[in-house]
Amino acid sequence: MLESLTLQPIALINGTVNLPGSKSVSNRALLLAALAEGTTRLHNLLDSDDIRHMLNALKSLGVNYRLSADRTQCDVDGLGGPLVADKTLELFLGNAGTAMRPLAAALCLGYSDIVLTGEERMKERPIGHLVDALEGGAQIDYLEQENYPPLRIRGGFRGGELTVDGSVSSQFLTALLMAAPLATQDTHIRIQGDLVSRPYIDITLHLMRSFGVEVTHQNYQVFHIQGGQTYHSPGEYLVEGDASSASYFLAAAAIKGGTVRVTGIGKKSVQGDTKFADVLEKMGAIIHWGDDYIECSRGELRDIDMDMNHIPDAAMTIATAALFAKGPTIIRNIYNWRVKETDRLSAMATELRKVGAEVEEGQDYIRVVPPAHLIAAEIGTYNDHRMAMCFSLVALSDTPVTILDPKCTAKTFPDYFEQLARLSVLA
């Protein structure tokens, strides 16, 4: 029997949330700190399942680190070069794409014998495009199904001319970019297809720059990385707040504010998901930006029809915010929802219908027509943290909502429901 949490109707949302560290930034920073020369102190590291999987993998690979008691500060002693193992290893990475993809590429730099595996859902998340790009020099075998983890990696990546499909996940390119400077030869990466989630590549390039490596590119179509380089620790690095996690609180304020301020991201943020606030503003919310905060106040929400490929994770929050808009909302160009923690397009359509919405699910879009009155329902979360957090917004109506398996938020935001309760005035 799955545990469940029933949220009673919320009359008002008001207050400030200090955001946990970004998952995307945390796992990239941990890997680069491990590869770099010198010790790096990471501040505001996210404490969640995905980060623990990366930390456990790095420990197995001989990386020393020291975590503070609350696990948000971490001193990482860099290896000054590739990750290697002197014995055969199996690394279990849960359902953490931000650990699986970058580690798969980084482990191709040395000559080890390492198996990367994870939960059942991880074995359904494609990795073939990354493996194809690496196979010019590296030896990689699929242990179960072609194009999917688990993988056996025995190294041998030297750089050179690579081609990678950019249309499924930007994490494949991120993985190649982070490994390439440590290859013996220069690397030139050509993108096939349309590059999805481009702002996530900007996060990668920003982090690499912080660790002393510059990448040149021609309009995100061809990337050039000099080989034979070493990452250098910046000494200290502050992980900014998670912009995807901010989306739930900002949307809640747009629907039932009051005013909510999220701190840890702002005008200078490296995360593309901060653009979520612009989408809310287009829908009618009132947004204020600071250097390290975003503030949202309630507005009459209008329907919207928009390409949201640039904010794939935060766009899910628009799908549930659409329940409170004046007319039908259409979210387009989101095929990559289908290869995330679950098939998010299918899951979102199924659960939105339960609360009374009329939903059209396309191959790469979703259309949501809000009901006159929301219906109380039990929401399946599909072991997907974002499904649980998105559907908490249903409680901003005059209807309670029951979230099944609420603990799945541990992937990125273990105390999400406590934070939501702290800002809520119940009806």
UniProtKB/Swiss-Prot annotation:
Molecular functions (GO terms): 3-phosphoshikimate 1-carboxyvinyltransferase activity
Pathway in which the depicted protein is active: Metabolic intermediate biosynthesis; chorismate biosynthesis; chorismate from D-erythrose 4-phosphate and phosphoenolpyruvate: step 6/7
Chemical reaction(s) catalysed: 3-phosphoshikimate + phosphoenolpyruvate = 5-O-(1-carboxyvinyl)-3-phosphoshikimate + phosphate
Binding, 3-phosphoshikimate: K23, S24, R28, S169, S170, Q171, S197, D313, N336, K340
Keywords: Amino-acid biosynthesis, Aromatic amino acid biosynthesis, Cytoplasm, Transferase
EC number: 2.5.1.19
Entry-linked NCBIfam families: aroA (TIGR01356)
Protein family according to the UniProt entry: Belongs to the EPSP synthase family.
Protein name: 3-phosphoshikimate 1-carboxyvinyltransferase
Source organism (scientific name): Yersinia ruckeri
Gene designation per UniProt: aroA
